[in-house]
Regions:
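Hydrophobic h-region of N-terminal signal peptides that target proteins for export
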Residues: 21-25
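Long, structured stretches of catalytic cores involved in phosphate-ester chemistry, encompassing
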Residues: 14, 28-683
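N-terminal secretory signal peptides and thylakoid transit peptides that target proteins
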Residues: 1-19
Length: 683
């Protein structure tokens, strides 16, 4: 049997596994001369491509029947030129109500590191807009790898100007310097939707509500609405994909998506929702959320069933009461729901990058109890207390204390019998470690939805007048820093096995972060094992924005969160509080001089952080060569309304972080440069 027939069999198996129609490349195919007319109204959510490989890419569209012109099958054309004079692949795919009129198409047999154009054609000859896509370089291709990573786009109360900026800049670069793909790290949709007529002035926390997502069913929880079935989730994706800037981005680059929490439910674990503080079994809803994600994301992921459509497993909503050693519920309906779609995957991108993507939400543990803990006014948790609570029954090798001491306080340990805080699960953890060990590219990039970097500050150094804010002897306070058992397992393995080039890219935090992941921080042993970068949100509201809108001016210690300038403007000093300590932010309040404030820094506080901006919107790009990796933060102002200019509007700053590939036993070292604008208190 010849290699071509073997390749066809392999691609057919691949297409079947991911539920996509297949077209195998034909370099001699010519476009038919039939007159074709573009009808974007018949393809209202545009076109997209995803998960590029050296020889294939997934293509996607939605051909709606709502315009009065029905279609049952679409032809798909892939060409090496935007005029479609030279076709390289052609096939057809069904569109049915079973997939909400979406379709997925695996264009295979393509050449590596190539630019292609594609379109969909209905039975009447109407065409979609033309999409552009790119294949990955071959495994031995050492050209620089360039990609963007993004997260947290909320089109119901913000504009996607960050995509406009990305599109504008990329189109003006030489071909060899353009982005190869966009890594979307989750919160592609926000399932929480406020309806403008239900909020004062049609506003929510200073943002204009668009009303562009309205659930056909839904449930009102507090002041917002959430999905209750598959139709609701599909409605959210349809509404989001009407955004012109998101459509343009998906038409220009292949996307590589994973999900975060909002694709299912913002407060949930596995298949269980938390509504008004009560746990609600939601196995059916978890399956529905996974199906909608699968239908609207062009990703090479494994789904339930073997056919071309998502075959939803039959599940019942049941409480989850029994958990394994990492907190994964063993109730059969829960296991079926969380495994209905497996988005964790790994791929090589040229010679310089091994990409590993994990599912950080489907297997996340329930979270421990925080009942009976002392009331602390300061917005942080004592690090020593979190160290015990976070690890649950696994603390100290399975010997957690019955009580926790915090200075002069002592109280029962509510988590001594609970599973540890974890999010990968035992099976995915083993898979991840195997893939990390097997990675041979210089840069091992972990696509992580929410990141591992710890945020902490030093309220123990507050002036005596604020002693009531923090328990005596409590030490450092942590704002984010859970899942320590899993992180130590991974980072200790990286250190012990001499793995270099570990790079974590993340989202979720609505903030820009740059730093070094480490198993521990001072006064415990600090030994970084890699570098980590977190991108700001595309449009979702930041902590800095919320603080400036809601924090009273007479609130004690306001200066730790907001720096009030003499001219009446405000800046997020929470960045300085976490980077340099409470004394630095208090000196800033007194002097107004960032240099004097940084001179008062606590050097033990955050040696793992080089950059932090809790008021940053935008995106990040990565450039990876054999011996260096560069990450650039592109920050824009709050995107309240869509920019009227093609460049997406003004910039706040552009900052790069470079790191040379380090050797086993060495520590990575980030080098920072401000290329444009002023990041202010973020450094």
């Amino acid at each position: 049997m010849d290699d071509n027939r073997l390749s066809r069999r392999a691609f057919a198996a691949q297409a079947a596994a991911i539920g996509a129609a297949l077209a195998f490349g034909r370099t001699s195919a010519q476009a038919k001369p039939a007159a074709l007319g573009e009808r974007r109204d018949l393809f209202p959510q545009g076109v997209a491509s995803g998960d590029p490989r050296p020889d294939s890419v997934i293509l996607w569209t939605r051909r709606t029947p709502d315009a009065g012109v029905a279609a049952h099958r679409l032809a798909v054309e892939v060409a090496s030129d935007p005029e479609f004079r030279k076709l390289v692949a052609r096939g057809d795919v069904a569109v049915t109500a079973a997939t909400d009129w979406t379709c997925r198409f695996l264009a295979a047999g393509l050449k590596p590191a190539r630019e292609y154009w594609y379109r969909f054609i209905d039975e009447q000859g109407h065409t979609s807009r033309v999409g552009r896509t790119l294949t990955a370089p071959a495994d031995d291709d050492d050209r620089p790898v360039r990609f963007a990573f993004v997260s947290c786009q909320d089109v119901t109360q913000g504009a996607l100007n960050a995509y406009r900026r990305m599109l504008f800049e990329d189109a003006r670069r030489p071909r060899e310097e353009q982005l190869g793909f966009v890594l979307h790290l989750g919160d592609f949709i926000y399932e929480l939707v406020w309806y403008p007529e239900e909020r004062p002035g049609g506003m929510e926390r200073g943002r204009r509500l668009r009303g562009n997502v309205r659930y056909p069913h839904g449930e009102k929880v507090s002041t917002f609405h959430t999905p209750t079935d598959l139709d609701d989730y599909r409605t959210a994706y349809r509404g989001y994909l009407l955004d012109p800037d998101l459509q343009d981005a998906r038409a220009r680059w292949p996307f590589v998506p994973v999900w975060d929490n909002h694709e299912f439910n913002w407060r949930s674990y596995q298949s269980q929702q938390i509504i008004n503080g009560e746990i609600r079994p939601a196995q059916k809803l978890k399956v529905a959320a996974s199906q909608a994600w699968y239908e609207y994301q062009p990703a090479q992921v494994r789904k339930a069933g073997t056919g071309d459509v998502f075959e939803a497993p039959v599940v019942e909503n049941r409480p989850v009461e029994t958990f394994d050693a990492r907190g994964v519920g063993q109730e059969p309906n829960n296991l079926a729901a969380i495994n209905a779609l497996q988005i964790q995957r790994a791929f090589r991108y040229g010679r310089n990058v091994d990409m590993i993507l994990t599912d950080n939400r489907s297997f996340i543990s329930p979270g421990g109890s925080y009942s009976g803990l002392p009331d602390i006014k300061f917005p942080a948790m004592p690090d020593s207390m979190l160290e015990i609570l976070d690890q649950g029954r696994a603390y100290d090798g399975g010997h957690p204390p019955a009580t926790i001491r915090l200075g002069e306080l002592e109280f029962p340990n509510p988590n001594k019998d609970a599973p540890p805080e974890a999010y990968l699960g035992l099976e995915q953890m083993a898979w991840f470690k195997d893939r990390l060990r097997a990675a041979r590219a210089p840069w091992k990039i972990w696509g992580h939805s929410f990141g591992t970097l710890t945020g902490r500050t030093d309220p123990q150094n507050l002036p005596a007048a604020f002693a009531d804010q923090w328990p005596a002897g409590a030490g450092y306070g942590v704002t984010t820093g859970a899942y320590r058992l899993e992180h130590r397992e991974i980072f200790d393995m990286v250190r012990a096995e001499g793995i270099t080039g570990l790079t974590i890219v993340a989202g979720d935090r609505h903030a820009f972060w740059a730093g070094y992941p480490s198993s521990d921080l001072p006064p415990r042993a600090y030994d970084p094992v890699g570098v980590e970068f977190v991108t700001g949100s595309i449009s979702a509201q930041t902590l800095g924005e919320v603080q400036q809108l809601t924090m009273p001016r007479d609130r004690p210690l306001r200066a730790l969160s907001i720096h009030d300038r003499p001219d009446g403007s405000m800046e997020t000093s929470w960045n300085m509080t976490l980077l340099h300590g409470v004394k630095a932010s208090l000196v800033l309040k007194e002097t107004g001089d960032p240099a004097q404030a940084r001179a008062a820094r606590n050097p033990e506080l955050s040696p793992h952080l080089r950059f932090l901006d809790y008021a940053g919107h935008g995106y990040a790009t990565v450039r990876a060569t054999p011996d260096e990796l560069e990450t650039e933060f592109v920050c824009i102002p709050i995107p309240l309304e869509r920019s009227e200019t093609d460049d997406g509007g003004p910039m706040r700053y552009r900052v790069t972080h470079r790191v040379a590939l380090w050797q086993p036993g060495e520590r990575p070292e980030l080098r920072q440069a401000i290329l444009e604008g002023d990041p202010g208190l973020a450094i």
